[in-house]
């Protein structure tokens, strides 16, 4: 190992949401004097307003700290802050590939949760040295010994050296830094070998093009050097290099073991994919990093501007968002009910919420979003296989030989007293139990196969409510399985509304259709004529509700007298309503599309 690397330590922090990861990062920055008290704002590394508000980290960040250890030597510590949510699992695995060690933060009041575990297993897969930290010991309900035991039982790590700390109060921070220096191995790698670096994040800067966050493993990268991206063979010239300490500053070179920023005139963020390998164009490395994959969206929904005039603005906003988020996809689509808009693809539910919230918040757009749907695999009668992300595109029933839907393997961690309620919820969602094991006396891990379509709506919210907020969920895609699925159309006055179509399991179709019609009846405003709301599978109507018409009393001015006069007036009114119904069209309000989302409740 090169002597010059022996002072470098690359590490990340793993934690479940809300276990105090970003606060701990703030304290490390303060303790090492990287940021002054005045500059330190809470959650320094979560730059997006949304990240701070939701208390989650969405994009990976890095920061370089200088630290003088108790042995008198100066160390360079690179903290690679990773997203903790399961939607961003691939980004996490790439960020981990860039480290040699990880701090495992466990909340002293909550214990080990599902996403902590999922991320720990990833860290172990990458052979990282794990430093356990038990955080929030200042809280009255903290149970340090219990959690220490849990780390040993559930994860199988030796926790006798686990550092008890409180990031909020600044307790134990010095001890954590010492552990990083002494336990995390220094990076290996030869600065003179051919260049080999991994991209673990990229974003778009309007002045400099795409900025890549990289970790150099072999060789050295310098300005004016020609580099090549492995996955697409494109070549670029390096313009500038930098590190965050914690604000960007330029450097002359990045050597093996270092983490930094490379700007190389890349114009399209899709060229700099997370997990890709960078090498020298003239003297390339032999092998790229293993494990690179193009992330595929799992959940889709339509996004339409409420004002048709905002279409261009929405397109620009989506373009800018996708510059920073290579996992997010979008393509134009039209809907008879909603006009022009886009079909967007996301990694998961949280990702979807974040994208929609950013569109509304950062670009001030008023949007209608359709119900999320997943990618179905359709085999038609001629044997051709097609993937469909929009229920409206499903071929007619008689042409479908089989329909397959994506399944997830879900790992749920919960308290033992909530097991019954959780099992019931999973059964309702067509889940198949795979495993149930008790971790100690208080916690349990439940493994289920559940169709993604059942998780997409509000599984997570329901899980939180049946477990009073204690259960945590982690999932991975298992593959496609055949299912008895049908397309449920909603007709309003006999006209199908494409944006309200959903694909459901046949057993559920009747119930779902009835619920939907009832919901829609409440939100569609009364007209001067009756409005029929029907749910149909193919040509068969399975549920109907009617929105009653406004009715003027045409007999008000008749007193007594002949019945035929009254009958004439009523007939005339009926005739008029019939004519209106033929030409009238029903305005469908925004709430109607939300009703589809809420039907599950």
From Swiss-Prot:
Belongs to the TRAFAC class translation factor GTPase superfamily. Classic translation factor GTPase family. LepA subfamily. Gene3D superfamilies: 3.30.70.240, Elongation factor 4, C-terminal domain, Elongation Factor G (Translational Gtpase), domain 3, P-loop containing nucleotide triphosphate hydrolases, Translation factors. Its main location: membrane. Required for accurate and efficient protein synthesis under certain stress conditions. May act as a fidelity factor of the translation reaction, by catalyzing a one-codon backward translocation of tRNAs on improperly translocated ribosomes. Back-translocation proceeds from a post-translocation (POST) complex to a pre-translocation (PRE) complex, thus giving elongation factor G a second chance to translocate the tRNAs correctly. Binds to ribosomes in a GTP-dependent manner. It is an enzyme of class 3 (hydrolase). This is Elongation factor 4. The keyword GTP-binding applies. Keywords: Cell inner membrane, Cell membrane, GTP-binding, Hydrolase, Membrane, Nucleotide-binding, Protein biosynthesis. GO terms for molecular function: GTP binding; GTPase activity; ribosome binding; translation elongation factor activity. CDD domains: EF4_II, EF4_III, LepA, lepA_C. Residues 6-188 form the tr-type G domain. It is found in: Cell inner membrane. It catalyses: GTP + H2O = GDP + phosphate + H(+). InterPro entries: EF-4, EFG_III/V, EFG_V-like, EFTu-like_2, G_TR_CS, LepA_C_sf, LepA_CTD, LepA_IV. It holds the Pfam family EFG_C. One of its GO terms (cellular component) is plasma membrane. It is a peripheral membrane protein. One of its GO terms (biological process) is positive regulation of translation. The keyword Cell membrane applies. It comes from the Bacteria.
């Amino acid at each position: 190992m090169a002597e010059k690397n022996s002072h470098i330590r690359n590490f990340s922090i793993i934690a479940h949401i809300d276990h105090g990861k970003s606060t701990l990062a703030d304290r490390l920055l303060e303790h090492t004097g990287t940021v002054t008290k005045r500059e330190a704002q809470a959650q320094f590394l979560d730059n997006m307003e949304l990240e701070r508000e939701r208390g989650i980290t969405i994009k990976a960040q890095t920061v370089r700290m200088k630290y003088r250890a108790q042995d008198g030597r100066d160390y360079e510590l690179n903290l690679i802050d990773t997203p903790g949510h399961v939607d961003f699992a691939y980004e996490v695995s790439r960020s981990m590939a860039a480290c040699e060690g990880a701090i495992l933060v466990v909340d002293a009041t909550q214990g080990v949760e599902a996403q902590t575990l999922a991320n720990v297993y990833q860290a172990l897969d990458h052979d990282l040295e794990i430093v356990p930290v038990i955080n929030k010991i200042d809280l009255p309900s903290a149970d340090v010994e219990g959690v220490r035991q849990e780390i040993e039982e559930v994860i199988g790590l030796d926790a006798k050296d686990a550092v008890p700390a409180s990031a909020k109060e600044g307790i134990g921070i010095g001890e954590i830094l010492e552990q990083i220096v002494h336990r995390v191995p220094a990076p290996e790698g030869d600065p003179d070998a051919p260049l080999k670096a991994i991209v673990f994040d990229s974003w778009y800067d309007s002045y400099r093009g795409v900025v890549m966050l990289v970790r150099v493993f072999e060789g050295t990268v310098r300005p004016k050097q020609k580099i090549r991206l492995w996955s697409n063979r494109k070549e670029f010239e390096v313009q500038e290099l930098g590190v965050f300490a914690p604000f960007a500053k330029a450097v002359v070179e990045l050597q093996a073991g270092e983490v930094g920023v490379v700007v190389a005139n890349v114009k399209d963020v899709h060229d700099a994919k997370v997990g890709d390998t960078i090498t020298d164009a003239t003297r390339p490395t032999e092998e790229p990093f293993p494990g690179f994959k193009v992330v595929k969206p799992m959940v889709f929904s339509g996004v339409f501007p409420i004002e048709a005039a905002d279409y261009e603005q929405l397109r620009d906003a989506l373009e800018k968002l996708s510059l920073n988020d290579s996992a997010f996809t979008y393509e134009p689509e039209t809907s008879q009910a909603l006009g022009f808009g886009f079909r967007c693809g996301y990694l998961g539910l949280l990702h979807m919420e974040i994208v929609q919230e950013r569109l509304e918040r950062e670009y001030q757009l008023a949007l209608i979003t359709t119900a999320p749907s997943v990618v179905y695999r359709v085999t038609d009668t001629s044997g051709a296989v097609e993937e469909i992300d929009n229920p409206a595109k499903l071929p007619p029933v008689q042409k479908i030989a089989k329909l397959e839907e994506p399944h997830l393997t879900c790992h749920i961690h919960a308290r033992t007293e909530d097991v019954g309620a959780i099992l019931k919820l999973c059964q309702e969602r067509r889940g198949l139990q795979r495993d149930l094991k008790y971790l100690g006396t208080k916690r349990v891990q439940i493994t289920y196969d559940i169709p993604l379509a059942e998780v997409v709506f509000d599984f997570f919210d329901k899980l939180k409510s049946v477990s009073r907020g204690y259960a945590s969920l982690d999932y991975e895609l298992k593959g496609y399985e055949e299912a008895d699925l049908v397309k449920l159309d909603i007709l309003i006055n006999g006209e199908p509304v494409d944006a309200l179509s959903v694909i459901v399991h046949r057993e559920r179709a009747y119930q779902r259709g009835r619920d939907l019609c009832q919901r829609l009846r409440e939100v569609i405003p009364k007209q001067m004529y009756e409005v029929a709301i029907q749910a149909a599978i193919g040509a068969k109507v399975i549920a109907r509700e009617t929105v009653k018409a406004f009715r003027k009393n045409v007999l008000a001015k008749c007193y007594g007298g002949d019945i035929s006069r009254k009958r004439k007036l009523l007939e005339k009114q009926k005739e008029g309503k019939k004519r209106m119904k033929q030409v009238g069209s029903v305005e469908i309000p925004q709430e109607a599309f939300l009703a589809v989302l809420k039907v599950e409740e």
